């Protein structure tokens, strides 16, 4: 595939090059045919460092015209070099990135950085550089500035995607003469430093490389080099050029160019200069000691979001007004300022105009949200993103509570989640933190200033006004996301106090394990009950030694008595008792399965104990439940390797697509999708609406939600091959405590879906009661992530009456017998909460198995002293460099896609072993380095990395991908939404008119709060904010599924909390059930009735917050109408 940008590039790939050729010979040959000085650079790749050339080369010509002539000569077979006919094709990258058009290579410009002052025409100039080189690389979609400072050369790189507006300007007084261009930026630019000494560069004097200019250096990433941290503080770049009018055609091609010319006045910004490494932050000294921290945090957040400028935020009149308000009033007004779509140049005026209306509304607003959040197990959390040059304060945002923050809830504003990210908020790449320097024949890593910046912030903390946030700990998921918890120590509680409260970590001499254990209690969890030490018994682990390797069959599994399990289930808000809970209890971590014969509350094993702790709160992170089962690319890859035909997967996907096909029009089809794909959530409001008689396309709210569900499913099919496996479940693993199961056997009892209850095909089920059955026969079992063919296990699912008596349900019971535990055979899993893919669909059960991989991990390095915080900080930053999980997974998929042996190929087996080491890196501290030889050179079309060399995949992945694309292409275009929304009179309750004014007030409050969430999270419409499914995501979310998943969770939590708050308004406004029906009907009326649609921005979801009440009204009205019709019929007779 050749992209459009490659044709605008002056570089070509030359094939069929003699392997005896050197750069000088190829240069002379090409310039003999094309003319002198027509080659800018060339390189002949070598298999070893500067020897053994390969049979192709890359050549970068000086112009596109020269490139075209060379391609013509090649097509005419006129480039004959020593009997070798040189063949030219498009290259996917330049050797030296530089503009092809010489007019886009500007020298001697003046670059001024700063931000707007009191209006758009006044520019607060922080720093100015003369003699700057500016390259506009349209092909690379970026602008580069080369700046010389204190004898060093730096490159400032601005991506087109980060430019929010481009303007032509006059800065020298003559309004008719354009002499500058202003770039307004969303994010900070990347900064590089030019380095020549001891760095292995691509261009040096050797036999296989040539460059016309002196490029014997390397750019390495660095932090803000300016003494006043002006780059980090700036949001705009102003470029002063000669003859600006003649440059209009070039600069008007930059993103979001505005036609009118701006007369710009520079204002000295020296007062905003800062020597601190964390910028931009308001100078706390001007605020005074009594200024509330919460308001200071929001002012900084507004500056970082570019809702107000740093100049406006420092205005003493604004500070005086905010200081004179109540804290709650000030925060509400600043939240309204966050909702502005563009920068507010006069926040003083904005605050003054909002004061009266906000105070009036607050008199009728409900009490503090703290109780409501606590009931939902939600906490409010401050966030900070730290980039190489800036800081961004965000929030507070809602997320699931953890035990640590909940225990210190009175200090919740002293906690902060800090994430280290790239300038555009994407994952910070390893080469930004470390580069390889060469000394003689040896290569060693050199840490960059960005590495030192992260390490310094972990050690010194972040100061925001009166608070200094210092490192506290990080959980395993935070480590993978380059995030930590920080805490602002105060007179009552210090960060060290919290760590001591969590437990004793001094016995752990491994840095990586010590760090992991510190983060154990930060897992999102629900706090249930205190369990005294005397109510806990220690039970032995079940272990075996096979071929010198030690295995633990009971690794991570314990027991809970039935009586206590009932109490825990009640605390979790469950109406039933699950078979097992995943828990954190003091220093214990794992799963506790219900034991009906136990009289001790908890029975725990040594394998569950990670550190000593005096905490006695039982924290529950999840419990066993019936979860739908899906294939993904990893599982399909291994099943295909083991002999499952491509047609099987294509047929399963076709069934999935067919199921989705009619859900937007057919009620039964919609019910089928919701009940099959939604697991425990199938009895939700949408299902109730469908069962009540609404057609998918007739009710606007129902139609909107079904459409989102439909599009999400199609997207996941296309991007992940997430194909439903009806004959399967995702189940938490438990152990056979009675020792009944033999090696190779499992016990699986599941809650049946509605489709399974209706189906007559029960050959693989043994019915237990009306809702559950035991699976009988062969099952395929694995655990994600899985890369080795041996991760797929085919086991015998059996019925055993003793397990039925124990009540095990919606979990998989593994044996305690054999040479090795089955969970360990599946990707090195254990029983501390791992979830297993289990399917009894004979179409995807292989007839053969490969031996499982040896998952004996590296031994962690032990220190001869207590682990220090400094060592944990260094481990955190080193992990950022060596986290290769994603790269390894992608490489494995690409090699398996192309190699006839698939996942059994040597490269894939090497990558599976590397992946195992990379997974264990967080515990062992031993990184898994990705060899260059295993890195893919081309990528299959289904990965959609079209900026890279791409090929058409002929494997099962390519077939599945193109089948979904074809299905999407055949979809009917969505009908344009009508101005009028269908109004259902059967939802009217007699007397609802008396509640219309109350309903309007509630509707407007809901609309304002939902709009605020939409703006904050970047949701384009109501359906996106309700589901968290963003169609147009920020680039950093599109690249990182983990980050997107986390944000999606926070969005749904925020909406859930808003709905809970709205329910509070509803309950408070009603005295009895009859009034609830009237108010619910009024909610519906002011939202859907055409007479009220245009009053305010109306959201269809508002009345359906009380959907159960509305459906009761509908049912009663339908029943009343039915009785009246019967009565009328009898009268007529």
Swiss-Prot record:
InterPro entries: RNA-dep_RNA_pol_euk-typ
Anything else known: RDR2 is non-functional in the absence of associated Pol IV.
Family membership noted in the UniProt record: Belongs to the RdRP family.
Catalysed reaction equations from the record: RNA(n) + a ribonucleoside 5'-triphosphate = RNA(n+1) + diphosphate
Chief place of localization: nucleus
Compartment(s): Nucleus, Nucleoplasm; Nucleus, Nucleolus; Nucleus
GO cellular component, one term: nucleolus
Phylogenetic classification of the source organism: Eukaryota, Viridiplantae, Streptophyta, Embryophyta, Tracheophyta
Protein name according to UniProt: RNA-dependent RNA polymerase 2
